[in-house]
Amino acid sequence: MPSTLRVAFMAAALASASPVWAQSLTLDDAITRAVAASPQGAASAARLDTLNAVRQGANTRPTDTVDVMIENLGIGGSDLNRQIQLTGTFTRRLERGGKRAARAGVVDADIDVIRADTLIRRLEIATAVQRLYVEAMAAAATVDIAQDRVAIAQQLSREVGRRVDAARDPLFAGTRARTQLAEARVDLEIAEHARDAALTRMALLLGEPAGRLTIGRGNFLDVEEPSASLQPAAVDVAIFEARRRRAAAELRLQQASARTDLTVSGGPRLIGSGDIAVVAGVSLPLRNRGLNRSNIARAQAEARQVEADLAVDLFQRRQQIALAAEKVTETAHEVEAVRDKVVPGAERTLAEVRAGYNRGGFTFMDVSMAQTALHEARARMVRAATRHHEARVELDRLTGRFVSLVQEPR
């Protein structure tokens, strides 16, 4: 196998072989466009609009009331008419304890939770895009392997045909060579279909017309080990911090609600005799201490629950990061070993066996076995690279690698 063929395969493993896919796409571009095309942004904006409207209502004082009352209406002559009373009162409830600010604080905390949740949802979109991108890269690399296999099978079929014509090999050798060529072409068709299907799924996620995308050039076989210090994604911690602020705001609201509100009222009273009086009143409800303590205790328990959930989540995420990093390292070693040792050896073996076969030193079966060994080595290399990049997808999600791409501009 010429060394240039191996170099071309490794340098362009991500390149699409079909001219139908005309628009190159990098992973960063794919993530940016998928997030922009997702209706998740409109849904999150609607949720925020709802909460902003709720906040406006929460930041208002209680509604004033106006009451009109007529008393002593009846039948009894002028003496009774002089006892008619018409009273108009204006009533206002005076909130105490900072209830208004506490209500607004709860809604502000809800808004923070929604924003943190929105960022997590956008990061999940990025993860879905990255997973599809890896699938498309693997499919493109498989196409390259299949194309190389077809090229080798064609050369071998011609060589065997010449030997059969010269009566140096039996007829079945030519039949077997043609069968292997047909099998290689079928595998190429299947690989191209899988590649096109992966790109179609990518186009659907991006909201693009199918048939206009191709994965940008890169090296699918380049692998790297994770860095030593990896921490959970800040966005995953941020939502717990937002929930913590929400629990603290709810506690302040319940503490403020423990103070009863003062209600004042006043107004004129018109008497049937022609006299005018002024009425005024003050109302102060008695505290329900048991209910207040219960509400405060519930809010405190919710705050403790958020802290406990955060501790559990961080514990689990650190374990998941360690496992994902180990998988990335393990698969990177496998890719490097197969790429740098197994595949070159299989290429040299096939080249040497073919040279010996042309000199009459080997049989067609020897060449066929060497060809199969090379194909299996390359396929194993692509499978290992696929597992490596899939493990990288999980690790990137846990560490929030693409947060900067999915954040909304401020």
Give the label of every model feature segment.
Residues 41-58, 114, 121, 125-150, ...:
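Amphipathic alpha-helical coiled-coil segments
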Residues 104-108, 171-180, 364-372:
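Short, charged, amphipathic alpha-helical segments
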Residues 17-18:
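N-terminal signal peptide c-region/cleavage motif recognized by signal peptidases
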Residues 121-233, 324-327, 331:
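Periplasmic alpha-helical coiled-coil/stalk elements that build and connect Gram-negative outer-membrane
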Residues 21-70, 93-95, 102, 168-171, ...:
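Bacterial Sec-pathway N-terminal export signals of envelope proteins
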Residues 9-14:
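Hydrophobic helical h-region of N-terminal Sec-dependent signal peptides
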Residues 24-26, 64-121, 238, 243-314, ...:
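Small/polar-residue-enriched beta-strand and adjacent coil segments characteristic
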